[in-house]
From Swiss-Prot:
InterPro entries: ADH-like_C, ADH-like_N, GroES-like_sf, NAD(P)-bd_dom_sf, Zn_alcohol_dh. It comes from the Bacteria. This is Mannitol-1-phosphate 5-dehydrogenase. The keyword Metal-binding applies.
Amino acid sequence: MTQTTAAVICGEKDIQLRTFELPSISADELLVKNISNSVCLSTYKAALLGSKHKRVPENIDEVPVITGHEYAGVIVEVGENLKDQFKAGDSFVLQPAMGLPTGYSAGYSYETFGGNATYSIIPKIAIDLGCVLPYDGSYYADASLAEPMSCIIGAFHASYHTTQFVYEHEMGIKEGGTLALLACAGPMGIGAIDYAINGPVKPRRIVVTDIDEDRLSRAESLIPVSAAKAQGIELIYVNTIEMEDPVTYLKSLNDDQGYDDVMVYAAVAQVLEQADALLGNDGCLNFFAGPTDKEFKVPFNFYNVHYESTHIVGTSGGSTGDMVESLELSAQGDINPSFMITHVGGLQAAPHTILNQLDIPGGKKLIYPHIDLPLTAIDNFASLAEQDPFFSELDAILAKNNYVWNQHAEKALLEFYDVSLSV
């Protein structure tokens, strides 16, 4: 039997670190060593609601569930019936969207299946559904971030357009069209900007809005206007915080026309109303952000639905194909999901990080379950140099890369904490 330590949901707003023995795996299961897990806002929502959340079981006070679903690692033990599919020592990345009628998924619903743990067991149902993907790379953060990137990619694929009297949807954002990304300078927004510029379908103009100047400045430093121009795309960053009439201004950037595609990255009524007003003929509003209020409602212009063919779509999660696309684009160097990461920590940081996501500034938080490190901003490792000179070395690695987390930094960190990637 293998001992694991995990961050588990025990009740509403109650996440604890617990150490316990994992059962022996069955012939149809995998025992895995979790190397990295990126923290998702959806986990905060599950922790906030506890058993009131659709994906969280009723009996978590007796059988807590492991948090975390954006994870990657190394296979330690393979069930007898799976030895023709997997082998110990192989790296994997989890695709958590199983699509079960119950909504159950890794990181929400299982006692032994989740990312914020040193070891976990991947059950038969996840394996049968093809949710364990081989990972040929050696940068585990990239693998973890394939899940959030798949959500972004899935949203771009789910948007659609129409031709009058042709009764087929043309899936995806409009090639050569105009794209407005609203409230889009947060971590997922940065991933969306990156994909919009470097993905397979390219608009001719992208306008990114936010109300936080620091976030906009960071987004522009990571993805400059010149990078978009090299792809034949006009990229414009806009802070709308003090604008009396942002809709008129944003339309003025688009030849006084509405946009072909508008994506919304915050569940804020005012932003959605702006999005509706920004739609052009056959414009698609993609509501990416997930609200927590089940009664969240916003007025929508149905005159334009009828006469201008405006329409709306929303997605939650991404498919296996979306995840594979993310891994391929990352491996080719076309996109860099690590732009989203601003903090790194060990497993002991997971409970506080999950429960306080809304109050911790920055982007994605990355947990390495086998290291002993408080949650640390990646531009602040120099402050730990008094504890150990290694952190000065790590800061130097990051400084050379515009303080973007990267494979070199990950390798150095795992080696410092003696994290073995072999079994």
